[in-house]
Curated annotation (Swiss-Prot):
Region (Disordered): 160-195
Cross-referenced InterPro entries: Mdm10
Protein origin, superkingdom: Eukaryota
Protein name listed in UniProt: Mitochondrial distribution and morphology protein 10
Description of how the protein assembles with itself and partners: Component of the ER-mitochondria encounter structure (ERMES) or MDM complex, composed of MMM1, MDM10, MDM12 and MDM34. Associates with the mitochondrial outer membrane sorting assembly machinery SAM(core) complex.
Length: 508
């Protein structure tokens, strides 16, 4: 379960049109959701409130093994109207899950607002602050978009003069592929009272660069990611097909081979240098992601490949090589595996994990065999009803034409029905533009249908090479989001259970 602050930050990126996945630090995000999911370490309770679309508050309480808490405040320049109660929020958006992200797009500038001959739209920004109790640590994050393709981040951590043994990390610091999570950091001789982390991101869709600087250890870093075969600002596949049909086929043009995985490649790397610790690091990575097929599919089209992501990471300094494969094998099951090896010492590690969406769909809850469900007011929209009728009509006509069983009476009846719809305010549509028109006319209906179709629970499991087994269950129970996890050591006979945790989140 992701935190409320991370949930707000992702919605803010979506509102301003910023590519959330087009970063080198997010190269292994798909496989990490199945193999590196975090378990609740204790009993955690989090309450979040949204008094206005641009201001949010959050309160967290950690009861075990000692009582800790925090208070958070977030404000944004862009109203986030989609964030509401825990029951109205899509469950798939508040958890880390298997996901194939769409191709990145070039960020567009903010809409111009003029008043008295001057532009007054302002600049996009997000401000976040969190106070940790009783240690009185203060952490925060400030992000703003300087240009349509340039964004700046400033994360800070302030602590009292006598720091405790456990110190929180700066919020939303991107992970590094050159350091392993199990490696302990080098203890500083005299801890500083705080730290400031500065990041500058330049995203053009095809290319993304990230420049970072940490004040505490004087570390300067550079991360880059390049997308091959990027078509963010070019014509779509449908437009290309129509243009080819108009122009005709060239003499030297060959037939396209069907089948296989159709996707896009992304390659990147990172370099960092610490002046105080006199350390240097480098890593490179490669990712292949399948591209969803263009709808509607032709009748003779091959079966589309399942959503798949393959990643390869290599650190030449320590000789660490890691490869991961993740795929969605069914609509409710996704699997992933990762193999890492050190080419210098030949030490290796294998991890296997997956997720299984369980529970009944929200739209089917409360239904009985004796009574039909009551239709929602938005589902009785006449425009959407006409869309469904036109879709059924198109499918029926295509089926009859293929079977050559259309009678003269049926043809006359269908012609009369089509003539009536020409004078109807509801236009005749195909499957290509039916979804677009439905979103334009009734934008609130699609989120409601997604909420009714989604499942309210997911079960995750992973098994690592050292025979540690982790199990996590995340679900929506009424208006609360619940996460329960257990970590077990299959080789330990005296104490096989390492940790058990429970986390409850409530959005209002």
């Amino acid at each position: 379960m992701i935190g409320f602050s991370a949930f707000i930050l992702r919605n803010y990126y979506a509102a301003i049109g910023w590519n959330e996945d087009n970063l080198y630090s997010s190269l292994t995000r798909t496989s990490s959701a199945l193999l590196d999911f975090q378990l609740p370490q204790s009993l955690i309770l989090q309450l979040a409130n949204s008094p206005t679309p641009i201001f949010f508050t959050s309160y967290a309480l950690d009861a075990l093994p000692q009582l800790n808490g925090s208070i958070s405040y977030i404000t944004t320049s862009m109203p986030l109207d989609e964030i509401g109660s825990g029951r109205a929020t899509a469950f798939k958006n508040v958890i880390e899950r298997f996901r194939v992200f769409p191709p990145p797009k070039r960020p567009q500038p903010k809409d111009e607002v003029w008043l008295g001959g001057k532009r007054i739209e302002g600049r996009d920004y997000l401000l976040y602050s969190r106070l940790h109790l009783p240690s009185l640590h203060l952490s925060g994050l400030a992000t703003t978009r300087l240009t349509p393709t340039l964004q700046a981040h400033l994360a800070f951590l302030s602590q009292p003069a006598h720091p405790t043994s456990t110190r929180p990390t700066p919020p939303q610091t991107p992970p590094s592929h050159t350091r392993q999570p199990s490696e302990p950091s080098t203890p500083a001789p005299s801890p500083t009272p705080g730290n400031v982390f500065i990041s500058l991101q330049h995203d053009t869709g095809r290319y993304c660069g990230e420049y970072t600087y940490s004040v505490q250890d004087g570390m300067v870093g550079l991360r880059t990611l390049y997308n091959f075969g990027w078509h963010g600002d070019e014509e779509s596949e449908v437009d290309k097909k129509e243009r080819r049909e108009r122009e005709g086929k060239r003499i030297d043009e060959e037939e396209m081979m069907e089948g296989g995985l159709k996707g896009r490649f992304s390659a990147g790397g990172e370099v960092y240098f610490s002046a105080k610790q006199r350390s240097f690091g480098i890593s490179t990575g490669l990712r292949f992601t399948t591209v969803p097929p263009t709808l509607p599919l032709p009748l003779n089209a091959p079966v589309p490949s399942p959503p798949t992501t393959l990643t390869l990471l290599y650190n030449p300094l320590i000789g660490f090589l890691s490869s991961a494969y993740s795929a969605q094998v069914s609509p409710t099951v996704a699997l992933a595996t990762r193999f890492g090896v050190n080419v210098y010492s030949y030490e290796s590690d294998l991890s296997v994990g997956g997720e299984w969406w369980i529970g009944r769909r929200r739209g089917k809850r409360g239904l009985t065999t004796d009574a039909e469900p009551q239709l929602d007011a938005e589902s009785r929209d006449p425009v959407v009803t006409g869309i469904e009728e036109n879709r059924e009509l198109t499918e029926k006509m295509a089926q009859r034409a293929s079977l050559r069983q259309v009678t003269l009476r049926d043809e006359i009846g269908e012609d009369v029905h089509a003539e009536k719809e020409l004078y109807s305010p509801i236009p005749v549509m195909t499957d290509v533009n039916a979804g677009e028109l439905a979103q334009q006319i009734s934008p609130r209906l699609q989120p409601q249908q997604d909420l009714d179709d989604e499942r309210d629970g997911v079960l995750k499991a992973r098994l690592s090479g050292n025979w540690q087994f982790a199990l996590l269950y995340e679900a929506r129970i009424r208006n609360c989001l619940v996460s329960a996890g257990v970590l077990a050591d299959l080789t330990g006979r005296q104490h096989p259970i390492r940790s058990i945790g429970l986390e409850v989140q409530y959005f209002s």
